[in-house]
Regions:
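Terminal or standalone catalytic/regulatory effector modules within metabolic enzymes
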Residues: 37-38, 43-55, 288-295, 299, ...
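Conserved, mostly hydrophobic/aromatic
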Residues: 6, 14, 36, 116, ...
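Conserved N-terminal beta1-alpha1 strand-loop-helix module at the mouth
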Residues: 3-46, 54-55
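Active-site beta->alpha loop and helix N-cap motifs at the rims of alpha/beta catalytic domains
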Residues: 34, 43, 47-163, 171-174, ...
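Catalytic alpha/beta core domains of metabolic enzymes, predominantly
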Residues: 179-363
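Catalytic cores of alpha/beta
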Residues: 98, 153-165, 212-227
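Glycine-enriched alpha-helix->loop->beta-strand junction motifs that scaffold or abut catalytic
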Residues: 40, 110-112, 137-139, 167-172, ...
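N-terminal small/glycine-rich loop or linker at the start of catalytic domains
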Residues: 1-22, 74-91, 138-149, 194-203
């Protein structure tokens, strides 16, 4: 039996899967950081460029400061950033020198482990990103094979990609990334040996979501196949569309004869903290999912499906949902089987909706579909169906989008901002709206303390003080007394 290590995804992927990436702010993360550091995880999946953008937009917090503070609060556990290569916050392909600066600043602020994936499986782009990361000081690069189900994504397809990764001197590990939770234990038993046969002694990891209930079983199968690193989430940030529960998976791994060297007490404390936080903030807890065979066909993530249903409801076309879902399968095949992770589910679903609603298929084509076809998101894994490609490229709008200038080089971008601006602030301003970064800067340093147990009381006091007839508020408990009085008599 194997010695298994764990990567915790609660703060980044678990948060994003269940709480829409906005559920945790800097103070809430810092409060649990020392406990997470004690658990003994191999790494913490901490952030992504998308996550950094969300911090600026929604909580008006400096994502660079968040990384630095977390690094100081949890010095013993590597922090991971997941990247899709030559993109930072924006989905536009960035200049290589720009990305080099991004990686340099991430390392300087405290990121040491980088998970590099390319949803199109463009290995040249992925491996070039790995090279830049290493040259800028990244300690560990984990190259991802993004799993999906289609006519072209067979075991040999992944094995060939893995062989290319294994030849690189800039990759320390390889992981099978199953963002939609499609990988069954049965498929794992053929896929993992096929990949392992082509990578020599390169360590493997498995990252499998629980979207249709498969993740925990797939992780157990992977451990039996001698995969030594599994990705998990904690407490309410596990299950649902997130990843397997760390607590339950550890119990099951040990029951199967594997060893997992973690601090169980610290893990229990972390689970309790996130549970209290979820209760205080009104955030949902992930629950085990039932198996849904239809999901294997359309692969539309839950959040995207909810949006699609709402759009049809607003149009009073709720009965069209089955037709749109069926069209999603057809469009995905015609576009070369893009893996259904952001932004591709949105792109495929938008086209499917237009095809069902319009006078004929592809009579309307959104800009993002055109950008996909002309390679703005990278080279499609499989060729776009020729008749569809010809029809899209013949549109005047396609010619306009093809004429769009590429992202400016770093030196040109730098000239647009003051010379004394820090690299960290420059990188945000180069890719985000000015008003959003201005608001973040104006907000000042992030709050660093948080207690979920006092949040309901604070909210109650805040609401009571708004009442015009409240003259005095009192709070008493053991060794504590608080009195708040109005400064003038109530009207």
């Amino acid at each position: 039996m194997a010695d298994i290590e764990l990567v915790d995804v609660s703060i980044r992927d678990g948060n994003q899967s269940l709480w829409g990436a906005t559920g945790l702010n800097t103070a809430q993360i810092l409060q649990i950081a020392p406990i997470l550091d004690r658990v003994g995880f191999h790494a913490l999946d901490f952030t992504s460029s998308t996550h950094m953008g969300v911090a600026v937009r929604t909580t008006r917090e400096d994502p660079w400061e968040r990384i630095r503070l977390m690094r100081a609060a949890a010095p013993g556990t590597p922090l991971q950033l997941i990247t899709t290569g030559f993109r930072f916050i924006s989905w536009e392909t960035a200049d290589p020198d720009f990305m080099r600066l991004v990686y340099r600043r991430l390392v300087a602020n405290g990121i040491s482990r980088f998970a590099v994936v390319d949803p199109m499986h463009d290995m040249s782009s992925l491996l070039e990103s790995a090279r830049l990361i290493h040259e800028e000081g990244g300690a560990e690069v984990v190259a991802g094979l993004t799993y999906t189900v289609s006519e072209i994504h067979h075991d040999e397809f992944y094995a060939d990609l893995a062989a290319q990764i294994a030849q690189s001197l800039n990759v320390e590990r390889l992981y099978i990334k199953d963002p939609a939770g499609l990988l069954t234990p049965e498929r794992a038993r053929t896929l993992i040996p096929a990949v392992r046969a082509r990578i020599g002694d390169l360590p493997m990891e498995v990252h499998s979501h629980c979207t249709i209930g498969l993740g925990p079983f797939t992780c157990l199968a992977a451990a039996d196949l001698d995969v030594r690193t599994l990705h998990v989430a904690i407490g309410p940030l596990a299950n649902g569309t997130s990843l397997p529960s760390a607590t339950r998976l550890v119990e099951n791994l040990r029951a199967a004869g594997h060893s997992v060297d973690i601090d169980d007490r610290a893990l229990a404390l972390a689970s309790d903290y996130f549970t209290r936080l979820a209760n205080a903030e009104g955030l949902p807890s992930g629950a085990p999912q039932e198996y849904d065979a239809t999901f294997l066909r359309h692969q539309v993530p839950g959040g995207v499906m909810t949006t699609l249903q709402r759009q049809l409801d607003e149009l009073r076309l709720k009965d069209k949902l089955p037709a749109v879902v069926e069209e999603v399968e057809r469009v995905r095949a015609e576009l070369g089987y893009p893996i259904m992770v952001t932004p591709f589910p949105q792109i495929v679903c938008a086209q499917a909706l237009f095809n069902v609603m319009g006078p004929e298929r592809y009579s309307n084509v959104p800009d993002q579909v055109i950008r996909y076809v002309i390679g703005r998101f990278g080279r499609p894994t499989a060729p776009v169906a020729q008749n569809i490609l010809d029809r899209i490229l013949a549109r005047p709008r396609a010619q306009e989008l093809m004429a769009e200038p590429p992202t400016p080089p770093l030196a040109e971008l730098r000239k647009k901002f003051p010379a004394n601006m820090s690299d960290d602030e420059f990188l945000l301003r180069a890719v985000m709206p000015k008003e959003q970064v201005d608001a973040m800067v104006a907000a000042g340093p992030a709050t660093r303390t948080y207690n979920p147990d006092t949040r309901p009381l604070i909210e109650l006091l805040r609401e009571l003080t708004k009442h015009p007839r409240t003259a005095e508020i009192g709070v008493e408990k053991t060794n504590f007394r608080l009195r708040l009085r109005a400064t003038s008599a109530p009207g």
